[in-house]
């Protein structure tokens, strides 16, 4: 790198310049050197050692004063060092950004005042330099001098420049000092940004092919019908009056016979390809595919490329500094705008944190209740249903009373300590012990009776307690859950049994949607002889889904259930080592080894089958499914690269703190991350070390979730408990929590028409246009800051990546 390029990089260093500021009598912070200039103009003696650059005439000093009032410290220093004097003269000559003289100056001429007024009337010119180029890379940024600082500088308040509700106090990018750097960047910087753009393009390709983008999902189209219909609103926003309505629970309204079941699709068929993935083709034409899904080889080539980029030293340093900059920018924003945010929030009628919509974006269904609730339920069944036959064990049917007598327990003996389902210190870094906590009193038979959908009583008890939890959710009105429910891939009829459990027991609510979790347990099934190869699991998981997509009448209950399913999750202990025994991974039908396939292999076969399925479902007008696996909780950070390519969002993601380049990519693409600090605290990472607050400050798309209330929560409202602990430990403001609640709704899989009611009719638009503060209680100023910061980062990527394309074209 030559000396000029090095100097340009040093000029744009993110290191803060030394501060030489003091408070004046009004409490405002001003620059000492600029104050001296103002004193000199007023006739006050100035130190003879004042640098020549600061001995400016009245026009120059005023221009510098006005800018310094709105610039951050290091940008102010940078501006002075790179020719403020010449800049002010240029702007004066071109009449592009002339400000009024301070009232205390005795050398102010009437021509200068007229020029200043002309400058105020052309606000667009005021935001440009003498070359006509914008001062900030983001066209949407509104950097207007705050009224208090205008008064201090002596400039009158002009109505045309009154700050809007979405503008915020912030330093501007001094492009006069960096324009040459932007126009002639170093080759290293071009290469780094080109790699970022390449990775983003790869993700866009995989997401588009698999129809995982929100705007591709038919359920987000205007004509989609939700059945049972969502509750009628009890408030008319037009007349601002309360409307008396009576909304019945969905379980009472739902009638399976009223559900529309379409007929067979004669145009398309499905079969297995060479990679043992299901593909969809024209009937009778196996070579005419509905979509070209990336092969296993293509996927691993792309994965290796991304891993190589993310582990490159300069790329890691670059991403780390960008993330540090984002965090520092947040700290400055929060320092200057905290009270304005609070003021807007207080003026918003009716809304506060408790009555904005929030979604528990990651919670396992079998652990959706707390211990006290489960204990009361077990005691109730022992009192009222003790003679009911509940399990077939040891060659005979046992009643509930006989089961507890075999355990030498009565209802009176039961307590929270007896259940022993809470994750205490002994589960830290012991996922095997944590899994045992799903067994009440350590007995698998009680888990089978009370916490399974597929048992002798057909999951009746689990349906009953789930309805009680749902009743609490519906009463709270503003809390919603996305429950993970298991399909193991051990047999072809699992999907039909699960769908029958949901439909027959009417476990249906407008507060609940489902994700199907796939445990990575091939090695156990292989050892017990349930499956012969990995292909058996893939077949059991996906063949019923392709069958019901081709002909919904072949599995009518499954078709109705899938309308309430958002997508797939992949679960298990990530800390297990992925040993690579093959130079080239075999396809599933040839994977007969006893070892479990690696995480990346599991994820690809979930992705490839879901991609073909989604293409077909979208063509038929059915809702599509997304991939939202557990990822980055423990184990190899490379799991996060696989998920970045293939998944719509992830759960946990705490290992992103170790891979800054991948974390930067997650920020740029706003990949949804459902974080559970209380869960991490019990298993893998103590609460104080959790990266959640840093992710939030930097602008990653994070939400809070409970994971397993049965193991981690003590109250009847585990989601509120999660928020409250985070607010206390991380000192989150009310606006912060409302922003997290809004994030959770955006990440969730509810239909667009429901999200419009929850967070605003234009929620899918970018920036302030997509925010409805009346519904979200998030001030426009916060949304504008988030959008402006992200836009600037994306524009930087596009700006510098274009240089490489231009060079290659030449």
Swiss-Prot record:
Q: What else is known?
A: Present with 3910 molecules/cell in log phase SD medium.
Q: Which E.C. number(s) belong to this protein?
A: 3.5.4.6
Cofactors needed by this protein, per the record, are: Zn(2+)
Reactions that this protein is recorded to catalyse: AMP + H2O + H(+) = IMP + NH4(+)
Q: Give an example GO cellular component term for this record.
A: cytosol
Record's subunit section: Homotetramer.
> Gene encoding this polypeptide?
AMD1
Which positions are annotated as binding substrate?
364, 433-438, 633, 708-711
Taxonomy of origin reads: Eukaryota, Fungi, Dikarya, Ascomycota, Saccharomycotina
Composition-biased stretches (Polar residues): 1-10, 125-137
Recorded protein name is AMP deaminase
Task: Output the superkingdom of the source species.
Answer: Eukaryota
Q: In which pathway does it act?
A: Purine metabolism; IMP biosynthesis via salvage pathway; IMP from AMP: step 1/1
Where on the chain is Phosphoserine found, per UniProt?
19, 58, 61, 138
Similarity comment: family membership = Belongs to the metallo-dependent hydrolases superfamily. Adenosine and AMP deaminases family.
């Amino acid at each position: 790198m030559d000396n000029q390029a090095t100097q340009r990089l040093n000029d744009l260093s993110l290191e803060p310049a030394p501060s030489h500021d003091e408070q004046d009598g009004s409490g405002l912070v001003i620059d000492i050197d600029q104050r001296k200039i103002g004193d000199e103009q007023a006739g006050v003696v100035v130190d003879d050692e004042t640098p020549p650059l600061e001995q400016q005439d009245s026009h120059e000093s005023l221009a510098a004063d006005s800018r310094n009032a709105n610039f951050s410290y290091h940008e102010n220093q940078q501006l002075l060092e790179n020719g403020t004097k010449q800049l002010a003269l240029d702007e004066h000559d071109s009449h592009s950004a002339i400000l009024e003289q301070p009232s205390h100056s005795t050398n102010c001429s009437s021509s200068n005042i007229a020029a200043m007024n002309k400058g105020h009337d052309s606000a667009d010119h005021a935001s440009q330099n003498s070359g006509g180029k914008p001062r900030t890379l983001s066209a949407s940024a509104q950097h207007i001098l705050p009224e208090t600082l205008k008064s201090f500088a002596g400039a009158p308040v002009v109505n045309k420049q009154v700050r809007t509700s979405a503008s915020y106090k912030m330093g501007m990018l001094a492009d006069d000092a960096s324009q040459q750097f932007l126009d002639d960047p170093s080759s290293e910087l071009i290469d780094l940004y080109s790699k970022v753009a390449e990775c983003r393009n790869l993700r866009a390709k995989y997401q588009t092919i698999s129809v995982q983008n929100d705007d591709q999902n038919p359920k987000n189209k205007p004509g989609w019908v939700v059945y049972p219909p969502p509750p009628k609103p009890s408030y008319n926003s037009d007349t601002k009056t309360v409307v008396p309505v009576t909304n019945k629970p969905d379980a009472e309204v739902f009638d399976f016979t009223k559900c529309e079941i379409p007929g067979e699709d004669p145009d398309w068929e499905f079969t297995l390809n060479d990679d043992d993935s299901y593909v969809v083709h024209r009937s009778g034409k196996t070579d005419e595919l509905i979509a070209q899904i990336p092969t296993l080889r293509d996927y691993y080539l792309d994965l290796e490329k991304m891993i190589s980029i993310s582990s490159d030293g300069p790329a890691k340093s670059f991403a780390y500094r960008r993330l540090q900059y984002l965090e520092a920018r947040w700290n400055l924003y929060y320092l200057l705008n905290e009270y304005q945010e609070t003021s807007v929030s207080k003026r918003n009628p009716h809304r506060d944190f408790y009555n904005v919509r929030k979604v528990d974006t990651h919670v396992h269904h079998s652990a959706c209740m707390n211990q006290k609730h489960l204990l009361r339920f077990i005691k109730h069944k022992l009192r009222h249903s003790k003679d009911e036959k509940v399990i077939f064990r040891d060659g005979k049917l046992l009643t509930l009373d006989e089961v507890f007598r075999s355990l030498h327990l009565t209802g009176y003996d039961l307590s929270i300590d007896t259940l022993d389902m809470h994750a205490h210190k002994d589960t830290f870094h012991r996922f095997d012990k944590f899994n045992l906590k799903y067994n009440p009193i350590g007995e698998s038979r009680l888990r089978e009776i009370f916490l399974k959908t597929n048992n002798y009583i057909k999951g009746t008890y689990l349906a009953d307690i789930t309805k009680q939890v749902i009743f609490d959710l519906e009463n709270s009105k503003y809390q919603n859950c996305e429950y993970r429910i298991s399909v193991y891939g051990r047999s072809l009829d699992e999907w039909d049994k699960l769908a029958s459990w949901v439909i027959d027991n009417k476990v249906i609510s407008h507060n609940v949607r489902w994700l199907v979790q796939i445990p990575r347990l091939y090695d156990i099934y292989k050892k017990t002889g349930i499956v012969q190869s990995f292909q058996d699991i893939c077949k059991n998981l996906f063949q019923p889904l392709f069958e019901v997509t081709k002909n919904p009448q072949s599995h009518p209950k499954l078709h109705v259930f899938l309308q309430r399913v958002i997508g797939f999750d992949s679960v298990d202990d990530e800390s297990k080592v992925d040993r690579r025994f093959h130079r080239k991974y075999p396809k599933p039908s040839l994977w007969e080894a006893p070892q479990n396939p690696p995480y990346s292999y599991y994820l690809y076969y979930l992705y490839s089958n879901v991609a073909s399925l989604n293409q077909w479902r979208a063509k038929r007008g059915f809702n599509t499914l997304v991939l939202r696996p557990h990822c980055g909780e423990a184990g190899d950070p490379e799991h996060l690269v696989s998920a970045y390519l293939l998944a719509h969002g992830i759960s946990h993601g705490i290992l992103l703190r170790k891979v800054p380049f991948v974390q930067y990519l997650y920020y740029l693409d706003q990949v949804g991350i459902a974080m559970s600090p209380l869960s991490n605290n019990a298993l893998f990472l103590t609460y104080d070390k959790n990266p959640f607050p840093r992710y939030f400050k930097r602008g990653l798309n994070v939400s809070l979730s409970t994971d397993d209330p049965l193991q981690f929560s003590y109250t009847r409202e585990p989601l509120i408990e999660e928020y409250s602990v985070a607010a206390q430990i991380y000192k989150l403001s009310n606006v912060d929590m409302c922003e997290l609640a809004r994030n959770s709704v955006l990440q969730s899989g509810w239909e667009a028409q429901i999200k419009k009611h929850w967070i605003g009719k234009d929620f899918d638009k970018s920036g302030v246009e997509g925010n409805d503060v009346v519904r979200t209680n998030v001030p426009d100023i916060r949304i504008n800051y988030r959008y402006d910061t992200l836009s600037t980062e994306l524009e930087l990527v596009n700006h510098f990546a274009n240089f490489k394309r231009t060079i290659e074209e030449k």
